[in-house]
């Protein structure tokens, strides 16, 4: 893929859902096509570099939504955190972000996946299903539930301990480093 010099792909959650995932689910083109299709759940995370355009050590893929997230060496397990994604302008819910981590056997690794999906429209689909059954078979409504965007990265946080013996989370380390930047004066 030939991209201009200085190109950086660092989309927000809203941009991933509205500008990429919604277009993919609606079968609309997205140019430039920077997110490849990949049956992601069959690959171990360390096999992903080189299969997509990556910014730093993170990669983005379109994949089919599935409950089966098992690879040859492990599996992707849910971290139990689902976050709604809202538009910045209207605060309308446009997507859901699910967090998963990769396990080798019973051991959790540092590999994280953020799975972006469009909101479930089952509440409106039950009303429209009666109408659509009467509609002509030539009209096709996109099935938004089939596609997800996955952002995969390896979390590289050292397991430093605080003075009282408790471990710092990655977010704690980020905030502490931002505090350090505040103390630096520019010439």
From Swiss-Prot:
Tissue specificity field: Expressed in root xylem vessels. Expressed in stems, vascular tissue of cauline leaves and tracheary elements of sepals.
Top-level division of the source organism's lineage: Eukaryota
Keyword annotations from UniProtKB, A to Z: DNA-binding, Nucleus, Transcription, Transcription regulation
Stored InterPro entries: NAC-dom, NAC_dom_sf
Residues covered by region (Disordered): 118-142
Database matches in SUPFAM superfamilies: NAC domain
GO biological-process terms attached to the record: regulation of programmed cell death; shoot system development; xylem development
Compartments, as annotated in UniProt: Nucleus
Loss of function: phenotype: Reduced plant height and length of tracheary elements in the stem.
Domain NAC: 3-155
GO cellular component, one term: nucleus
UniProt xrefs under PROSITE patterns: NAC (PS51005)
MF-aspect GO terms: DNA binding; DNA-binding transcription factor activity
UniProt DNA-binding residue ranges: 94-161
Role summary: Probable transcription factor that influences tracheary elements and xylem development by negatively regulating secondary cell wall fiber synthesis and programmed cell death.
Other comment: Plants over-expressing NAC104 show severe dwarfism and suppression of tracheary element differentiation.
Domains (record comment): The NAC domain includes a DNA binding domain and a dimerization domain.
Protein name: NAC domain-containing protein 104
């Amino acid at each position: 893929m030939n991209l201009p010099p200085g190109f950086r792909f660092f989309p927000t959650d809203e941009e991933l859902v509205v500008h990429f995932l919604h277009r993919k689910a609606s079968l609309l083109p997205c140019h430039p096509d920077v997110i490849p299709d990949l049956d992601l759940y069959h690959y171990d995370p360390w096999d992903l570099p080189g299969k997509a355009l990556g910014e730093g050590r993170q990669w983005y893929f379109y994949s089919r939504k599935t409950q089966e997230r098992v690879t040859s060496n492990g599996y992707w397990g849910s971290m139990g955190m689902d976050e709604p994604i809202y538009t910045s302008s209207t605060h309308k819910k446009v997507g859901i972000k699910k967090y998963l981590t990769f396990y080798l056997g019973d051991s959790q690794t540092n590999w994280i996946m953020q799975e972006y999906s469009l909101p479930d429209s089952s509440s409106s689909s039950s009303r429209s299903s009666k109408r659509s059954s009467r509609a002509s078979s030539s009209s096709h409504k996109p099935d938004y539930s089939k596609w997800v965007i996955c952002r995969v990265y390896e979390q590289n946080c050292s397991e430093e301990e605080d003075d009282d013996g408790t471990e710092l989370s990655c977010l704690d380390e980020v905030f502490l480093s931002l505090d350090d930047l505040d103390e630096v004066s520019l010439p």
